[in-house]
Amino acid sequence: MKQYPGYTLVKREDCPEQHGTLTVLTHDVSGAAVLLVENNDDNKAFGIGFGTFPSDDTGVFHILEHSVLAGSEKYPVKSPFLQLLKSSMASFLNAMTFPDKTVYPFATPNETDFKNLMDVYLNAVFCPLAMVDKGVFEQEGWHRDEDGTVSGVVYNEMQGALATPDAQLQNALSRAMFPDTAYGFVSGGDPASIPALTYEKYVRVYRRHYSADNCCITLYGKMDMAEKLAFLDEQYLSRMPKSASRPRLTVQDEQVGAKRNIPYYTEKPEPDEAQCALAWYTGAFSDRERQLGVEILLDALLGTNQAPLKAALLEEKLGADIDVGFDDSTLQPTLELVLRGATEESAGKFAAAVRKAVDGILEKGIPEELLMASLNSTEFASLERPGSIPDGVLDAINASAGWLHTGDPALLLHTNALFASLREKLEQGWFNELLRELFAPAPVEIIQVPTLPRKEEEGRAARTDGKLVLDHPLTAADLGEGKKQTPGSKELLAGAELLHHPSAGNTYLYLYYDLGGMAPEDMSCLHLLTDVMDELDTEKHTAQELNTLRNTWLGSSGAWMDCWTGRQEGRPCHAKLIVGMSMLERSLEKAVELGSEWLYETKFSGPQAEAAMERVASQQKLLMEQKFLREGHAFAAMRAAAHFSVESALSERCNGVSYYHYLCELLEKADWTALGKKMEELWKSVLKKNALTVSLHGSDAALDTLKKLLPGSAFAAEKRGEAKPYTEELTAPVNEAFIIDGGVNYDVLVWPMERRLERKVLARVMSYEYLWHNIREVGGAYGTGMVTQNDGTEYLYTYRDPHLKESYETFAKGPAELADRDYTGKDMNEFIVGAAAKLDTPRKPREEAASTDCKYFCGITDEMTAAERKSLCSVDAAALKAEAADLSARMEKGVRVVFGSKEAVEAAKELFDRVETL
């Protein structure tokens, strides 16, 4: 068995879930835990996680997370992390604070980049200049401005983060569940407490927790592990002897039946916006079978509106929606149920309703087919690992959790045996007993009631502005030629356009129904329909029965709308209603069968359908109100871009403020019979167009199977209809402000600009050379940047910004400042590498499938991509300065949209043509 000098082998084992082997090591001198995940994934990853346990609400570990990335002994520049963002090929580059740990992970497909990033990260966490430079603490944590107001990046971020009713409810619940341990504190920091943190305590906390024997290091992917381990040993770990004792978490005595009422202060308190959260403990972290069983059980009982427990609770009509939360990453995992859209009176009845519903389910027993469906879909998701976060980053986070709570970094990476065991227990009544045990204790209960706001009460080693000097800086030569599309096939079969993209692994089937020619005023209704579809009965099954079958046979399935601006002449907008299904290849026939029933046999009328429409509309309205507070910049950008782009105009109708207005109008009219008729009419018109494209991402054998299935399926037609561009008349530009609760602002400026890939270089320079310093470091906003979009729009934005008018003034000065700067060849190389590398970010199979289909509809060829890439890589300083000089005039034609506080909007009301309170 292979040995590594300087390390003691703990264990080495095969891991089919990771397609390779796991090796757990302990570093001899420092005591650091190390996990090696060796497989053939080219998207290599690194992560280092520390056990960080807050003892107050000052957010010290969140501030440290920001601070250590602000300069180190080897890299003594103010923002090495920022400079990495500008020039790295990383597919993931971040740091994150959890309630009990802080993790610093990255992923990159480039070997040289990996070495650079690993050294910068290690030097940052072990040798930060923040320990001798109080200015970092003041910038990232908190300080007082000349007028006495408190500011700071984390302080401002948390003002926005904790402004939402959900965040306040969650924090109150954590305090009630864990009154005596670290989990009861706000790890991100409460703005009311952050100014109590002194620099001296901040330094002490760092020295206590950022030690090598209090960390877990993960190396993942296809790489020379011996080389990386030797670097770790020689450059860092061998210089760090073990500390006297590691900090440890304490176990909370379980709180049973604790109750508390809390207010949520808002300018528009509504009687039906109360919430109630109930929480229970789910057992030991180390009992992974039990925790996986809880996940499966919650999916079966609460995963959809028709699931037994959720359906029973919704029938009580105590509120508009019920959410379920489950966190099995902490020392004492918990589950919670949250009733939303309730009155104060109905919120008080929620706990009794849950008890009654659980007892009813236990009396009948949980249907085995329902449990099997949830087990299957959960297992598929655990193997597929959907989403954009690289697998290696997920492994690094999971390794830190496993090491922290059990000493075994590999614990969470093994799941096959757990699923096999639970399959055996499914028929033994194990899940019924688990349900009984989970809900037996009285829950911790928090009721939140909206209330009008109260009246305010009357209370170093130098870092340079220089460039980051890496041992092996990347150049344009490191970029390679870019990934080419795998050749596929296209044919007309059974009245449908059939695309095949050869791929291994899971099978992905996408059905694209063309929406060109649809009336713009109908698109909001059609979008709502895609959400309602999961809730409707068919001619053969109830909605719950069909959902159970879909979960049994498919990894995932759903319907949604999307649109893209094509590269064809005239830049048409291609709008599609998409039905997507993922599965094991052997389930392809079942996918066609279930998809046919779901799409062609749905019932839109009757009490069941009308109740589903009302329920989903209410739930979607609540969800949007929550998102306005968290993602205001995205809604603002969509709203403003709708004046310049058909793609954005359609997106705004289906996902923006216009869609929110549509939902409010529906709920006010409450004519669900009429809505059902409208939905059925729209659905039939989409299907009758017969402009269907079927895209299969899978093996040749899967293609042969699909060719046999399509002609006899409901998708078949005599001939294929014509696909058309989606069009609508754009509205005249309007500067708008939308008032939200929260005390922070999301400021956006959007302008039209013909799409050119070279503009991505300018966007990176604007984002990281100008906005980062002036908006984030000086202005105190949590985020900012410039974005170029494929639909022919560009925009500047701020995120959780304490300022409004000042930020627009800063925006306006940017073009001239960038045009006046001098850029060296090294500068241009960094900008180009950073911009071009994003074109090659590794994608997971599901993402790759969606991207391939999008390119097909938009007419994007490998030749186009190569030409654009060449153009981007040839941008020189003169071209960049010319683009910057031209930007000012374009920005003057832009539209301002803000989601912000009442005070900030009123102070800058001359900037807006229209103001609305959401």
Per-segment meaning from a language model:
Residues T58-A70, M523, H527-D531:
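Active-site recognition of the HExxH zinc-binding catalytic motif
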Residues N43-F53, S79-C127, K134-E140, A167-A192, ...:
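M16 family metallopeptidases and their MPP-like homologs
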Residues S874-L918:
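In a subset of proteins, long, contiguous C-terminal domains/tails are tracked
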Residues F92, V203-R207, Y264-T266, L309, ...:
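Generic recognition of flexible, low-complexity loop/linker segments
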Residues R144, T149-A212, T218-G221, M225-D233, ...:
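Hydrophobic, small-residue-rich alpha-helical packing segments that form membrane-like cores
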Residues M1-A45:
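Non-catalytic terminal extensions that flank enzyme cores
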Residues V203-Q235, S651-G656, L675-L709, E892:
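Non-catalytic, conformational "gating/processing" segments within enzyme and secreted inhibitor domains
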Residues V37-N40, G47-G49, Y155, Q159, ...:
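His/Glu-based metal-binding/catalytic segments typifying zinc-dependent metallopeptidases
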